[in-house]
């Protein structure tokens, strides 16, 4: 879309990839333009031409050395588990439906064991991973709601399917 809008080859670099079925909020990306453009016009154009399931909330000009992936401070995954007796058909694409009672206190205890720097190779969906599988989890928060349990994983990065497997 940017190449079509600007008439120049534009490579977009995201701060990370998402697994299939994962929705990203606050995903950061960067790109370089040879000629400066009005950020408001770029933002309007992007939201006009991008697929309907992608929206750009803001666009900011930054230093040319900025790299969205290598300068990300942390990333947070939210994993939602629907625990109600009746499936939520409206949220089915966004939550995991699990109607067996869960022990939230034990989940919190187990989460504490995962904090810190560890080799998460056993929790990676890609068995042929060539890069380091060592990651640091800074926080795991388990929140209980009326018919849903939300798990928030904050770390320096995540492996393919790591959060889904940990959950």
At which residue positions do the language-model features occur?
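Structured-RNA-binding interfaces characteristic of tRNA pseudouridine synthases
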Residues: 1-167
